[in-house]
């Protein structure tokens, strides 16, 4: 399909409103889906709570409160499954951030997202890494992506964001919009400013940017 045909087909769509409970379910699907990057699965307790949130029985803040109480009890009996703990809390906080009506195209907001998601999970939540690292990827034949130099993480992100702020998407066709967003997302992710949680943080940052 040519760019002209693609733009034309997009313009032919009629906007419809998505029911609120469907939006809630989509937010949870995204939040839990992002945990699969680290092979994390939610607990049965979160699966119950999220359904109560989708149907409107509990707010997202009540869900987090219930989860914290649940894990305090688990900790006292030494029964915490830590992978589920991380998945449950981070998924819930992703949904919380998706519901927040705020966004700032800035390095500080990237730090804010990471700190918000991973407080109580990582002691370095919201802090840029101070060491360089590599990670062997099977998809790259055990080679590593060239992640950002730890000395210039803030500058690298600020540079990418500065370029993004100069773009006028109203002047671009749909193909160019998609290509530009893809490139921006990839550049942010490749910097990999945190020791852990980069993919989830970048994905949520871009999602908030696009809303």
Could you describe each region identified by the protein language model?
Residues 1-211:
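FIC/Doc superfamily catalytic core
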């Amino acid at each position: 399909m040519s760019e002209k045909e693609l733009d034309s087909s997009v313009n032919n769509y009629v906007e419809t409103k998505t029911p609120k409970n469907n939006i809630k379910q989509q937010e949870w699907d995204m939040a839990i889906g992002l945990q699969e990057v680290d092979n994390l699965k939610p607990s049965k307790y979160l699966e119950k709570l999220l359904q109560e949130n989708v149907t409107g029985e509990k707010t997202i803040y009540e869900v987090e409160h219930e989860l914290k109480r649940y894990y305090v009890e688990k900790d006292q009996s030494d029964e915490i499954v830590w992978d589920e703990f991380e998945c449950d809390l981070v998924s819930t906080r992703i949904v919380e951030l998706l519901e927040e009506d705020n966004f700032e195209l800035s390095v500080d907001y990237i730090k804010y997202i990471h700190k918000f998601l991973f407080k109580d999970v990582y002691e370095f939540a919201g802090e840029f890494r101070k060491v360089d690292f590599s990670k062997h990827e099977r998809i790259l034949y055990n080679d590593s992506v060239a992640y950002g130099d730890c000395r210039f993480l803030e500058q690298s992100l600020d540079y990418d964001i500065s370029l993004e702020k100069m773009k006028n998407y109203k002047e671009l066709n749909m193909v160019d919009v998609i290509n530009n967003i893809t490139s921006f997302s990839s550049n942010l992710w490749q910097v990999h400013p945190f020791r852990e949680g980069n993919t989830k943080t970048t994905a949520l940052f871009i999602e908030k940017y696009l809303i």
